Amino acid sequence: MDFGSLETVVANSAFIAARGSFDGSSTPSSRDKKYLAKLRLPPLSKCEGLRDNLSLEFESLCSEQPIGKRLFQQFLKTDERHVPALELWKDIEDYDTADDDLRPQKAQAILAEYLDPQGTLFCNFLDQGMVTRVKEGPTGSQDGLFQPLLQATMEHLSQAPFQEYLESLYFLRFLQWKWLEAQPIGEDWFLDFRVLGKGGFGEVSACQMKATGKMYACKKLNKKRLKKKKGYQGAIVEKRILTKVHSRFIVSLAYAFETKTDLCLVMTIMNGGDVRYHIYNVDEDNPGFSEPRAIYYTAQIISGLEHLHQRRIVYRDLKPENVLLDNDGNIRISDLGLAVELKEGQNKTKGYAGTPGFMAPELLRGEEYDFSVDYFALGVTLYEMIAARGPFRARGEKVENKELKQRIISEPVKYPEKFSQASKDFCEQLLEKDPEKRLGFRDGTCDALRANVLFKDISWRQLEAGMLIPPFIPDSRTVYAKNIQDVGAFSTVKGVVFDKADTEFFQEFASGNCSIPWQEEMIETGLFGDLNVWRADGQMPDDMKGITTEEAAPTAKSGMCLIS
């Protein structure tokens, strides 16, 4: 009997069972009651100091933070003066993500309901000059049609309505959630499943948050290996960038904590495996992707790169292995340990970083470079998705790094027949040796890439709203990862002793919950709805007074309601 294969089968079965529904969400039965009981809103007496330490910026509190946005909208709904602005806000967001064939009808409804003085929800706070321009402008399905109205609405809400919110019970409820969000968390909150892969400093395994049942991927960075290989800088850079960037095309960081041996990053689990695995391992007799599938992934990578570059972050390690598929078949880019953040006023950086075969000529020559190196790597990635080999070596060819460097710097790329003229031309523009001529990030956007004929069938608005159906949907019964025995194990690191500076670094790294992903988890798994209990008479809820559900039970006739 092959015990290695048996171990993989058992581990895969446990992992798939824990996943439950393949979307990675949880059900009440998958929650650990002991840890679920710890997720309880505190009495207000514990939240008194939070208001003074909290940034009271409108956009952060009421738009960016998911729980903050929900509570602010719930507050607006309780006051008829604010309902028109609330409903206009929601309807514009609905219009922005609607299918093209539904947009004209939704646009007409917005004009009639909110901009007409006879409308049921007429918004009298809007500047009439702006209203006239919107009414007289084009109508239909174009993007940004109501952007001026949305900006004006948010400006209106950030004034008196926001100040009223700050004095309301709904803001006190937000403080309760912020207190809960700030509570310490460690490895005991997570249940580990099978190893999914291995990086330079440790393993990546599937894990489950015990209180909510939500599945994640846990990247474990061995402390001794980090110190021995001088990996502290890369680890903290990756954590800082993941904390800062929130994009559907980049993995999200939900938790950061330490154990005795590891620094742990708990991130979005991508159950579909990595693109390299799909290129070579899913159909070994027919490696590579059809062109439409490769184009779809390329479009999503472009959106992810744009989000990084708009935040002045050079990725430096784009390759199929770092592009992961989620449950639905959409991709996110991962592994930002080699990324570098350009300072304000700094346009370029320098340094040897990346994976052989994916590094741009200017980087290999030791020159300064900018975001353009990532678009060269995108060209290599697109080429490999279609051809099932890199552009600078034949499949299975062993090439010394010195020879590979020379090919990248000076040799032209040859394209097999699998490439259409459009995909070849696009690849050529990405693999341009001269970074000044290379297609890429210009004037703060990737619009020049989006306009390429290769993407004529892609609706970028729907792509970025997560509305398109991917060309490949992973099988819920399959684990898209190497067998456990093929992942390999790390050797023991000896002779490493930690000092005070190391301990301080570990403590800084282990910052606990990350606000936006944590709030999203509370909403997605139903915990927000379960705990967001209000009295029907509008008075202060019992949990704010420190009265438990059991203690409040005898007076339940006074009426309670749930709002999620």
UniProtKB/Swiss-Prot annotation:
The active site is at D317. The modification Phosphothreonine is found at T8, T492. One of its GO terms (molecular function) is ATP binding. GO terms for cellular component: membrane; photoreceptor outer segment. GO terms for biological process: apoptotic process; negative regulation of neuron apoptotic process; photoreceptor cell morphogenesis; positive regulation of phosphorylation; post-embryonic retina morphogenesis in camera-type eye; protein autophosphorylation; regulation of opsin-mediated signaling pathway; response to light stimulus. Expressed in the retina; primarily located in rod outer segments of retina photoreceptor cells (at protein level). Also detected in cone photoreceptor cells (at protein level). Residues 562-564 form a propeptide. Keywords: ATP-binding, Cell projection, Kinase, Lipoprotein, Membrane, Methylation, Nucleotide-binding, Phosphoprotein, Prenylation, Sensory transduction, Serine/threonine-protein kinase, Transferase, Vision. It is a lipid-anchor. Belongs to the protein kinase superfamily. AGC Ser/Thr protein kinase family. GPRK subfamily. This is Rhodopsin kinase GRK1. It comes from Mus musculus. The lineage of its organism: Eukaryota, Metazoa, Chordata, Craniata, Vertebrata.
